[in-house]
Amino acid sequence: MLSGRLAQAARAAGISAVVVPMDGFHLANTELQRLGTAERKGAPDTFDVDGFVNLLQRIRAQATATVWAPVFHREVEESFAAELAIKAHHRLVIVEGIHLLHTAHGWERVFPLLDVAWYLECLDVDQQRARLVQRHIAHGRTPKQAHVWVNTVDMANMERIAATKHRAHTIFELATW
């Protein structure tokens, strides 16, 4: 992922950096099933946005303590708490996720907590769709299930995300993904 490469480059330049993905704040599958939203996992309202905002506030206010964050594991489609350590010495915190610019469901509280926001736009939607299908297949879905998921859930997310790109400080257009 680009966020990991940016953190690696920063560290190579002597800047302590950490990547904080919003994916750790996916609601648990059992909770998504209880809420009836499991079939749309990844939509803005299927995350613990309050927990994510709280994490960002804690990081910004951090003086000396370590702030712990959950990490999402795609191979089991669940998050594990307190797996990522954000330390006070981290000078660069790269926050990564698809809903950082969203303006509803509580996500509007995220943008003011970011010093800068970049939007990465893949100009080849067919390539992006194909990569998403392959990712879903690699994590256990059948090709048919992967295509259905991408054409319903993922494409709806992509449209929702694209509608907020104007909020980004910089938009990077990527010819290939």
Where are these regions (language model features)?
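Conserved nucleotide-sensing/catalytic segment adjacent to the nucleotide-binding pocket
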Residues: 18-21, 27-76
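Conserved catalytic segments around the Walker B and adjacent sensor/switch elements
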Residues: 13-21, 119
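Small-molecule kinase domains that catalyze NTP-dependent phosphoryl transfer to phosphate-bearing small molecules
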Residues: 82, 105-108, 134-177
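ATP-dependent NMP and nucleoside kinases share a basic, alpha-helical "lid"
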Residues: 76-135
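Helical mechanochemical/support elements of P-loop NTPase systems and associated helical scaffolds
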Residues: 45-48, 128, 157
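Glycine-rich phosphate-binding P-loop
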Residues: 1-8
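Short glycine-/polar-rich loops that comprise or flank the Walker A/P-loop
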Residues: 15, 112-116, 166-169
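Short helix-capping segments at alpha-helix termini
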Residues: 10-15, 139-141
